[in-house]
């Protein structure tokens, strides 16, 4: 049988470990991920985002629990294949960046998309930023469509639905005694990791929204 047919069967049967053995889609590898690390590129990004009505976001932090997490950066996207990572741990101060992006994030007319966006909402709230309108959450959509499975993580959904094996978090921070903080990870690595999250979330949103 052809690879696409085998892939489709594995996806339908939720054979995630077998999906990893198949060759990746060439189309899925085409991407444009940008690091926003200076005032000029930040202002250009905000101009672009302010024209939109829906934006995908993803926060990168130092902890899985939002109340213990320190915000490291924020990913933005408006269409699959394109994403931006705004670093809060680069050349610009965290205070300057948050002051610049706060009006966009608190815009009532803006609908935000995310995966488990409740986490991002809490993390941003810790920085005195309140998202006003949640448009779509891919983890909730997946749960509504498949309530009898526990496989709703972004990694699992990306592999099952997109045939895409995401960058594992362990490749950035390690694990066990050798684990490091996200604050110590090189910006280019976090950029690729976060932008991939945004990209996959947008692709999953397109699929899940049509199925609901």
Predicted regions and their residues:
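Short acidic alpha-helix initiation/capping motifs at coil-to-helix transition points
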Residues: 1-2, 149
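Long, highly charged low-complexity segments
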Residues: 2-74, 88-104
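Active-site-proximal helix-loop-helix substrate-binding element of RNase H-like nuclease domains
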Residues: 65, 69-212
């Amino acid at each position: 049988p052809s690879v696409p047919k085998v892939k489709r069967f594995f996806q339908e049967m939720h054979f995630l470990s077998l999906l990893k053995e198949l060759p990746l889609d060439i189309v899925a590898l085409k991407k444009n991920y940008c690091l926003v690390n200076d005032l000029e590129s930040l202002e250009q990004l905000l101009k672009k985002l302010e024209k939109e009505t829906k934006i995908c976001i993803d926060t990168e932090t130092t902890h899985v629990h939002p109340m213990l997490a320190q915000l490291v950066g924020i990913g933005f996207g408006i269409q699959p294949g394109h994403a931006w990572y705004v670093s809060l741990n680069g050349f610009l101060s965290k205070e300057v960046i948050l002051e610049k992006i706060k009006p966009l994030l608190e815009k009532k007319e803006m609908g935000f998309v995310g995966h488990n966006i409740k986490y991002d909402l809490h993390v941003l709230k810790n920085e005195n930023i309140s998202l006003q309108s949640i448009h779509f959450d891919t983890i909730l959509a997946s749960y509504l469509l498949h309530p009898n499975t526990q496989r709703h993580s972004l990694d699992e959904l990306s592999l099952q639905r997109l045939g895409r094996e995401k960058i594992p978090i362990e490749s950035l921070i390690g694990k066990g005694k050798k684990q490091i903080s996200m604050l110590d990870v090189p910006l280019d690595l976090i950029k690729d990791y976060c932008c991939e999250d945004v990209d996959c979330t947008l692709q999953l949103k397109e699929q899940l929204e049509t199925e609901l």
